[in-house]
Amino acid sequence: MTDTIEKVASTNPPTKQATRYLGNCTFIVMAWHQRLLEIKNKAQQLQGEDGEENSAYLQFFRTTISASDAAKLKRCQHMDDVAMQPAFIALWQQVEPTLIKSTANHSAYNHKVSDNAFAAWLAVAWVLSQVRTVDDRYLVASAGKSKRQLNNTLACVAGQRQDDGDRPLITPLRFEKLVSARDPNNFVSLLARMVAQLQQQGQAINVVWLANDILHWFADYQGSNYRTPKDKLTVQWSLTYYQMYSD
């Protein structure tokens, strides 16, 4: 776990489940966040080790996102503020045509992106701007004797026990408040604060899982996304959190 550029450029590929909602936007998100880390670390720029596609996205973001742009995005207090930030606009310039192309034959929105999808990507940009320490693992073993393989989602990190071994990093009350949120602004605000807290506690976060789960939540919010309660993100998060905490 590290926030160095080299770790982010790991050849460890995202799992299919971790990119279910990101789809063709996965490499866009990875390159966009990599640019934010370059700014934060003031590190030597990479030379496209993640393939030509990712390298092209990264070069675009290097020319469109400055240090002040990244700082302004991180300081946003509301999703409406995010929409006006150059760092988000650069991301959306790559995401929007990709979404339109991928949904053109499967959606009523053949020539535009839904308002819900736009809001979801505002949330992705805002929350991911809080992440400065990155974990590139997509599966992790639980801390207990069972050593069960769990998806390396935010819930998995939140459910890890603190050093004293008695409490999870995020208290059950605070976690339940997040998964009980029904309003997008409330959910995203709580999520951004939780991510910031985990980062302050020295915890690394997988940004692909995080972005994918944000899109999952907004798909659930839009309705008719799941067939059973277990398909909902909040249910999956709750199961992972308590498995990690109680194992």
Segments (PLM) and residue ranges:
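Basic, alpha-helical nucleic-acid-binding regions used in initiation and control of genome expression
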Residues: 2, 10-247
